[in-house]
From Swiss-Prot:
GO CC, alphabetical: cytoplasm; nucleus; proteasome core complex, beta-subunit complex
Protein name per its UniProtKB record: Probable proteasome subunit beta type-1
Hydrolase listed as a keyword: yes
Active site: residue positions: T11
Compartments it resides in: Cytoplasm; Nucleus
Gene: PRE3
Propeptide feature: residues: 1-10
Described function: The proteasome degrades poly-ubiquitinated proteins in the cytoplasm and in the nucleus. It is essential for the regulated turnover of proteins and for the removal of misfolded proteins. The proteasome is a multicatalytic proteinase complex that is characterized by its ability to cleave peptides with Arg, Phe, Tyr, Leu, and Glu adjacent to the leaving group at neutral or slightly basic pH. It has an ATP-dependent proteolytic activity.
Species: Encephalitozoon cuniculi (strain GB-M1) (Microsporidian parasite)
């Protein structure tokens, strides 16, 4: 018998500003109910050279929104002959979620235009700009850690340590988070990617 359950990125996602840019991170588990459908999902979706979407919620819904954003921003960039702004991407994602309440999508849109930008978009579509943002089922376990330990002006190395600790903590406590840890650092000079396999998740 076929299951009607959606594949969920029930998830830990995080984005922070550091001294030169934005650092994003996520776990890699997706599931359908109690069944773990993938342990290596990439929840950090690149939609332009320097704008990413961190996805939590329904895999299908969040992938659809990300694909639409990528298409729209590519067309906008060509028509306007300008580099898309992070705020434009976030505002469009917020509008899509708000106007389609059946979508199960909580997103963080982060990147670098003229400065580092981090936007949190809730399941209902509300949009807020933050210095750091977390989302997904694992976020409940790391809010206190992030609130106490994040500080303005962290170096990239400090940011990587902060994000790795936060996602590791969520993986160790949230049954819906797991797998490996992926990160991307987005700055004026480009994008750097980091990967920690499951045996490198901090205990």
């Amino acid at each position: 018998m076929m299951s009607n359950e959606k594949e969920m990125t029930g998830t830990t996602i995080i984005a922070i500003k550091y001294d030169d840019g934005v650092l994003i991170g996520a776990d890699s588990r997706t599931s359908m109910g109690a069944y773990v459908s993938s342990r290596v999902t990439d929840k950090l979706t690149q939609i332009t050279d320097k704008i990413f979407v961190c996805r939590s919620g329904s895999s299908a819904d969040t992938q659809m929104i990300s694909s639409y954003l990528r298409m729209y921003l590519s067309m906008y960039s060509q028509l306007e002959d300008s580099i898309p702004q992070v705020q434009r991407a976030a505002a469009l994602a917020s509008k899509i979620i708000y106007e389609n309440p059946s979508l199960l999508a909580g997103l963080i849109v982060a990147g670098y235009d003229d400065k580092p930008r981090v936007f949190n978009i809730s399941l209902g579509g509300s949009l807020t700009e933050r210095d750091w943002a977390i989302g997904g089922s694992g976020s409940a376990f790391i809010y206190g850690y992030c609130d106490v330990n994040w500080r303005s002006g962290m170096s990239l190395e400090e940011g990587i340590r902060f994000v790795r600790n936060a996602v590791s903590c969520a993986i160790n406590r949230d049954n819906a988070s797991g797998g490996c840890i992926r990160m991307s650092a987005i700055s004026r000079t480009g994008v750097q990617r980091y990967f920690y396999p499951g045996d490198k998740v901090l205990q």
